[in-house]
Amino acid sequence: FEGSEDADRSAQLCIKAAGEAMKDAGLDDFAGDPKASVIIGSCVGGAVSISDYYEHGKKASDVTKMPISSIAPQVAGQCHAGGVVTNIANACAAGTISIAYACELIRAGKADVVLAGGSDTFAAVPYAGFLSLHALDADGCSPFNRCTGITLGEGSGVVVVESYEHAKARNAKMYCEVLGAGVSSDAHHITAPRPDGEGQMEAINRAIKNSGLKKSDIGYVNAHGTGTAKNDDAEFLSLHTIFDGENDNLSVSSTKAMTGHCLGAAGAIEAVFSIKALTTNTVVPTLGFKDEDMDKLAEKAGKIDFCPNKAHEKELTSVMNNSFAFGGNNASIIFSKEAGNVTVKEEKKPLVITGIGVVTPSGNSVDTYVANAVKNEALTEANLRSSVGKEDYDALGLKMSFYRKLDNFSQLQAVSGMEALKDADYAVTGDN
């Protein structure tokens, strides 16, 4: 692909990865094909352009490079994909969810081939954010071992997801089939995972159920494995709860010890690790263990092989890739050597809208908005901003301990979302 010099670094990396994926798949140019799509995940989008904007003169040209939404269209422009082009922003699960969404598009008959993946760069904005959270390990991350923090990385991973018939018709090589995926939410905390691992286990179990496999069929799991104490403890618990007694031949590793945490690109890059592990029958290692760490690992690992330091050969039929992100965004996906058809359409069901919530400069409820709209009063510069206050939170039962931690945009979303649920007469409880 040519002509990406003016793009943000995140888009440049993604364009490079997409070009490599298309070449590997034996694809050239989509020539506007309406069933060729691009789905790209990212955590921070054009972070380098954000830094450049504030550090080097606030150039207007930097603004259009900042949003996460700028990445997928630039990839689509390079390969002339004429189908669905969209971006996924579910933090560090974005890359995995992009691949899962690509499969759903194909199964629904909306696409034949999708470039799916993720991209993020090392930049001042994410570095400062993780530094302020005291989440960085000064010595390099050590997943499932020291668990004292993450190491930031950067990169992009893209895979070509294709319907079985479309790939077969053009005599394409097939690495594997995507059997199933699961996505869930912790609904717990903006950064910390649920300590009981319930959200993670929901995503894993959904992926296994959707794949039609038994737990014992999974030979290898590429874990989220960030190297933070809370994440690794929750992931240890999730893996043991699901697989202990069901799978005594499971291998698990975190490749973040080699790549660093590539944020929204992590799931896609780790999908590539997982697919290559599957196709080469090689379990990749978790690096960073010293001799004195082995006894402690043995206590935590039980019968699970966490692959310390060395790769090893293993006959693999199905593998799993897990991404458990900030905000409780959980995703799990299963790749398999088993042949199959991924174009089965889901049964069409009637869909209805049952609730509406709005936060606008003209009012923070549908009734108020409509009443002010009827007056036909033009908005002035003084009242162009939307705002929410204590009266909105109190009316919806939102506690200060929740909304005081949110930025303005998240506060607006929380109020409009809760208004919609209230309008739909849908009660939010700890169970749903």
Residue ranges and their predicted role:
Residues 1-83, 123, 131-151, 157-159, ...:
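Conserved "HGTGT" condensation-loop signature of ketosynthase/thiolase-family condensing enzymes
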Residues 95:
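Short conserved active-site loop signatures built around small residues
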Residues 98:
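Active-site histidine-anchored catalytic micro-motif
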Residues 102, 160:
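Conserved RecA-like P-loop NTPase ATPase core
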Residues 165-170:
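Short helix-loop capping/hinge motifs at secondary-structure junctions, enriched
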